[in-house]
Amino acid sequence: MKRSLHLLVIDPQNDFCDLPASWRPVDPATGGTLQPALPVAGSHADLQRVAGLIDQGGAGLSAISITLDAHHRLDIAHPTFWRQGDGSAVTPFTQIEAAQVRAGAYLPRDPQSLPRALAYLDALETAGRYRLMVWPVHCEIGSWG
């Protein structure tokens, strides 16, 4: 029986990589250096090892699959979607619950998004696995991240 070896690489994206300064490109719009949004310690070295594995042993792999985290600019899990009840910004790593939205502590910036946002929060909470976490903008479709 022939052996099947499938490599799965999960979200190997710039926004998750602790890139050394020399690997970070210049932002053509601002002239500043682009920074990863959510760097994971050791990820750059991990991906260098994955690249070496593929280089040296790729012929022995049956398949390679790669997942990507991808978000639109306006995403329910990003600060750009939300505001606090007083109108101020919601900071990354804020957890938002449906009851807080119903009480007016947090609101979508677009009032027309309220019913859908509440339905989503209710579904998350009913499933009992997650509460909504507001993440820094990351892995935006079409961006360097």
Predicted regions and their residues:
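Active-site acidic carboxylates
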Residues: 1-145
